[in-house]
Design a protein with these regions (language model features):
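Short N-proximal segments of mature Sec-exported proteins
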Residues: 24-96
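C-terminal partner/receptor-binding element of secreted or periplasmic proteins
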Residues: 107-137
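Short coil/turn segments at secondary-structure boundaries
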Residues: 85-89, 104-109
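N-terminal signal peptide c-region/cleavage motif recognized by signal peptidases
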Residues: 15-20
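Sec-exported extracytoplasmic/periplasmic mature domains
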Residues: 70-78, 102-106, 121-126
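Bacterial N-terminal signal peptides that target proteins for export
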Residues: 1-8
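Short helix/strand-capping connector loops at secondary-structure junctions
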Residues: 94-104
């Protein structure tokens, strides 16, 4: 029985282990930069609303979903890829991140949006290198 499960898991493991840069985005959680920037304009991240909903509502929901996506990347990478400036509270400035992404060359926007957002956060909010400790006497 165990070997049967192992054989069933092999295709899944192969798919998960493949090079993510070589495969196209698989769904709304795996966007490229173009898709992330276009989502607030075209309503593409509001598929769960259905086609009967007004386009204005789809655009509004898609815009909020794109912002939540960026804030999710920020929450998951804070302290490892970027650091909150001293005294700052609240989330990073989403509009500033969007501006950073828009400023990228068009070819960079073919890359995974999650990587682009994390890189924009790291550039805008870099972590300060740790100060070397003085030896105690």
């Amino acid at each position: 029985m165990t070997s049967h499960r192992t054989w069933l898991a092999l295709p899944l493991l192969a798919a998960l282990g493949s090079n993510s840069a070589a495969r196209p985005p698989a769904g709304p959680w795996d966007l490229n930069g173009h898709q992330l920037l276009e989502a607030p304009l075209d309503g593409s991240l509001a598929d769960d609303l259905g086609p009967q909903q007004p386009q204005e509502l789809r655009v509004m929901v898609s815009s909020r979903t794109a912002a939540a996506y960026m804030l999710g990347i920020a929450a998951g990478s804070e302290g490892a890829r970027w650091c909150r400036p001293a005294g700052q509270s609240g989330p990073p400035d989403v509009q500033a991140l969007v501006a950073d992404l828009v400023a990228l060359p068009d070819t960079r926007l073919d890359e995974r949006a999650s990587d682009l957002v994390a890189q924009a956060l790291a550039k805008r909010y870099p972590c300060k290198p740790a100060k070397p400790r003085r030896p105690s006497r």
